[in-house]
Amino acid sequence: MAPVHGDDCKLETSAVSDSGSFVASRARREKKSKKGRQEALERLKKAKAGEKYKYEVEDLTSVYEEVDEEQYSKLVQARQDDDWIVDDDGIGYVEDGREIFDDDLEDDALDTCGEGSDGKAHRKDRKDVKKPSVTKPNNIKAMFIASAGKKTTDKTVDLSKDDLLGDILQDLNTETPQIAPPPVLIPKKKRSTGASPNPFSVHTATAVPSGKIASPVSRKEPPLTPVPLKRAEFAGDLAQPECPEDEQESGVIEFEDGDFDEPMDTEEVDEEEPVTAKIWDQESEPVEGVKHEADPETGTTSFLDSFLPDVSCWDIDQKDENSFLLQEVQVDSNHLPLVKGADDEQVFQFYWLDAYEDPYNQPGVVFLFGKVWVESAKTHVSCCVMVKNIERTLYFLPREMKIDLNTGKETATPITMKDVYEEFDSKISAKYKIMKFKSKIVEKNYAFEIPDVPEKSEYLEVRYSAEVPQLPQNLKGETFSHVFGTNTSSLELFLMNRKIKGPCWLEVKNPQLLNQPISWCKFEAMALKPDLVNVIKDVSPPPLVVMSFSMKTMQNVQNHQHEIIAMAALVHHNFPLDKAPPKPPFQTHFCVVSKPKDCIFPCAFKEVIKKKNMEVEVAATERTLLGFFLAKVHKLDPDILVGHNICGFELEVLLQRINECKVPFWSKIGRLRRSNMPKLGSRSGFGERNATCGRMICDVEISVKELIHCKSYHLSELVQQILKTERIVIPTENIRNMYSEPSHLLYLLEHIWKDARFILQIMCELNVLPLALQITNIAGNIMSRTLMGGRSERNEFLLLHAFYENNYIVPDKQIFRKPQQKPGDEDEEIDGDTNKYKKGRKKAAYAGGLVLDPKVGFYDKFILLLDFNSLYPSIIQEFNICFTTVQRVASETLKATEDEEQEQIPELPDPNLDMGILPREIRKLVERRKQVKQLMKQQDLNPDLVLQYDIRQKALKLTANSMYGCLGFSYSRFYAKPLAALVTYKGREILMHTKEMVQKMNLEVIYGDTDSIMINTNSTNLEEVFKLGNKVKNEVNKLYKLLEIDIDGVFKSLLLLKKKKYAALVVEPTSDGNYITKQELKGLDIVRRDWCDLAKDTGNFVIGQILSDQSRDTIVENIQKRLIEIGENVLNGSVPVSQFEINKALTKDPQDYPDKKSLPHVHVALWINSQGGRKVKAGDTVSYVICQDGSNLPATQRAYAPEQLQKQDNLAIDTQYYLAQQIHPVVARICEPIDGIDAVLIALWLGLDSTQFRVHQYHKDEENDALLGGPAQLTDEEKYKDCEKFKCLCPSCGTENIYDNVFEGSGMDMEPSLNRCSNIDCKASPATFMVQLSNKLIMDIRRCIKKYYDGWLICEEPTCRNRIRRLPLHFSRNGPLCPACMKAVLRPEYSDKSLYTQLCFYRYIFDADCALEKLPEHEKDKLKKQFFTPRVLQDYRKVKNIAEHFLSWSG
């Protein structure tokens, strides 16, 4: 709308009269005055006469007010602050302060980029403004006016959802500038010195010094509108120079490249609004007319002080961040920063960090991303180098004789290399449309598992363009038997041929500029062939830009999708890879918050942010938030994105939401420009990793798993274990309530900001990046893959480099399809017994390490532990075991022998052979580590250098120790089962030989495992123990060149329970000649995560007591007191809930388990995923508690997440479960070798029913009986102690009499058990009721027999106790596997031995003849005379015969 003249205004307002009549108010023709006509005729005459026409200029009143620049700025600011819309219902109509003619500029800009197919520009959708209602006149005039005033309106079109238009606009944005600005370095405006690096810290405003004028408001930026972007802006500028004049000239800012460091204007926008992303104005005043119920400043402060933690209490060095001057670099991307190379020619030198290839869309092309030095700016900036024309390289192995492919039979025609060439040229190239190729004859070596391939032979090497599809892997011809290299990737060929081992400096000769931008990097170059790229050695790496970020999501209750509501990031712009991590680990930060769709921001939230001087951007919608984050990522250009669970959850959610919200230029999350987002949600995370190519992902969860062992890898646990501090967890269901008050929302943002800092601190504490760089340089793979874990790939690349350098053909990659995993595969071995296999677990491919049978018991004398240093790598070196040296059986023959019991072990190589490649590579690693450790011992070393050396030696050790793994890993590219079997065979042989040697020295070996042995010294003198250890060490080491055994430790006392399970007090000598002890646990329940903390603490107490120097009686007494106390505490509810939490890891995604209900951790994991906030997946640890919920379900189906227990009143901790199946088994197993403590006693002390533990005790006693030579050596009392006593009611008084022997009493008071009733007042004798007694015995015997034939089986695992009658199909060597726990075997609840013993017991208690024979003669005579008359003896024999009768049936 243009400015309106004053007279026109009057005409417009008087156009309609008050009468409302159309006729009366219609415009009339006005009569012209006569004077006017005369003047006009006069002018016409003069014109005809030839006189010049003189134009008379009338004086017009100006419609514009002229002001200076300062006044104009104030006027615009006043307009912005003025809320001039009355009662807009909060819909967010905005006045941005610009003049009306500014809209024309904006519309013109839209016309240039948003013109549709009809040639008309689509204008921006605008919000409807609520206006006062006006009564419509009911006359014909209103109809005419309305129809005349209508304009045709175009249908609203969402430009952001038009992918084709987006691609066109992206191409338009890449115009080449005519004049490129020179590279300049512009310092960014400094923040105030009082600002804290924490955006949530509260500071009092400082007074402005005199002489300086404080600006009352900060500069406002115009709204963000997409416009065509010049090439210089796109590829060079991270941000525009902060000059107001330049900004006013440009008028608009392009969304994705805007400078987001300053506060930005925003208002609420429609979710469907496609064009502009706006950010709330942090500096604007609150909307007038809104009444606040409480003072926001006072309320926030008091709430934060009383409840919410304050980040300002952290030890933050404010000077470090405040002194950092962010340098924004402008570069001319049309002129590459070339330098002089080794040959004095201009080359492009850069440090490569990451590589990417797209074999389907751009075959034969590799993108290298890294950093390049810009001399004019004195800094490193990002760059992308496109390496083209990487050819496929194939090797054809010629046959000896030509074969007929139809029949498969050989002919008599010998083959020459020319025949191979002709077959490829005439048949293969034509069939697979290879129009152009190169070939030559080469000599290559081969040393792998394909049979009938010679060790050395001539091959036909064929090279052709990668744009032609690859040949089949199993291709065979008449003249050639094998083709190698069909599926080798372009990236692998490039890295191997150019000998590039991990991130390093590269130089590109003859670099070419690209016509169209392919990346978001500052510089882009192209190498037309891979030979133009060369390695520059021994130059230190440049500093990188590292961004740590954290985000908070909420699940939409309608569509159950995760929506991002807030993000925080910390950035360090010069993070070194070869020095100690910087302190603090970040220099700048940003935070952005949005809101769920069904929430509103708290009242005066912006005002609180403003008053507290917080750097928080407020986004009206999730789309705005995501756009802001992408713009920030593009501007800051981080090389590494750091997060926790970023690969398993956050990155997938982030990309899904970007895609869902149609945020433009999604690919800025990485460095490669792409329009189509890769497929997300795959289990391998392949699409998510590809989306960020060029920016490495560092997931601290993955890194920590490789470096340290934790109970779980949740962020809270890592913060506690590594940073030794506490992290507060905000439940997902509480997030929505955080939007009720500004203080609550600020606390949420503070929490997210803290998480980002925790993540960064964990990364620095473990030196994740320097270690990953060193490992990558050693292995020669890609650093982004190293950060993702996976040792197999690192070993693969290390061997690939080694075999390529030695002119070997390497094995092709195989595509493996893992078989469907069966239920129960996720569980571990039972009690470490390698003979017990899990359900569905196939037999081991080859025998592993030897584990000697332990001599179970408690040792209170010094135990010596000897250990071979790096046993398997040392064996490989000692015996020269390699692909190239060991003769293996052909794979067909090997498969035929796989099912046989006897394992085929290849012979050792000839000692005179040259060292193979595998032992040579391991020796290199070992020797390099020794050199680095020697360097570390130098005096006066720089601390940074010491750290660098330490990281390098750790990387060398990790790599060397994992080398053996690639031989035995069936999915490895270098899998060689015979070699792995030979290594483990020699390991078993060496351990057994060492044991025999020690025994010959008259020493007792009590245990041994793979590479270590334990020796009982029977000494209490530590000095003598070390002398003895050195003696054994010297004797063993004499036998080998490279194998070394060493003293690994001395135990003061040892509790050896079974294989791989022991507890010990380790001796650590001190400088003063004494020693201290430290407790060490191996394989016990209390070191496993799937036991609750209460059980672990109890187990630790018991072990501490057993290992102490106290007497046995004191130890038993202390354990008894402690268990009684724990039982009472659990029943009283005085134990915190956290002590009951059980942690168990998922081996696959929760939805992939077939029996979800019976696995408690899977059941809880599914519930967690359904709630939103986080997603648990394979490899994650799930915490749960077993509760009483009023149902009769088994304990495994009554598992709940801890937060469920807190929220649901009907849930309570199942105390019986924790006492019987958590605490009892742990303590019982530890106390098993201790005299005076058994499972029944432990149950009694814990307040449990001891009868349910007698079955387990009985089976243990059966095993002990077998060891002792059977029941023959046991007394009657021992033999029948667990039998059910015979009970019979007295017919006279009804008292229950219990019989367990022929006699009652002892000595002089001995009498027959049937002589009198146990009731003193009853005078009747049971011997007079023999018929009733006989009938009761028959009924009891029948009941026992029925119990046996019921066939109930019970799991012998105390934590399971599953009862089942159906015999399962899965068996181990020890019996049928329990289908519930899949860990232990099932035993008969009432075995045949139990029945037989019970029947023998019934016979025994009535066998008077046998009982009398065992008595001394004088006692026997006395009893016969007094009690055992012939009639009584006859009665006893009758009852005994009943038992004899049933025993005769048992066979």
Swiss-Prot record:
A zinc finger (CysA-type) spans 1290-1320. Coiled coil: none annotated. The modification N6-acetyllysine is found at K230. It catalyses: DNA(n) + a 2'-deoxyribonucleoside 5'-triphosphate = DNA(n+1) + diphosphate. Belongs to the DNA polymerase type-B family. Catalytic subunit of the DNA polymerase alpha complex (also known as the alpha DNA polymerase-primase complex) which plays an essential role in the initiation of DNA synthesis. During the S phase of the cell cycle, the DNA polymerase alpha complex (composed of a catalytic subunit POLA1, a regulatory subunit POLA2 and two primase subunits PRIM1 and PRIM2) is recruited to DNA at the replicative forks via direct interactions with MCM10 and WDHD1. The primase subunit of the polymerase alpha complex initiates DNA synthesis by oligomerising short RNA primers on both leading and lagging strands. This is DNA polymerase alpha catalytic subunit. The lineage of its organism: Eukaryota, Metazoa, Chordata, Craniata, Vertebrata.
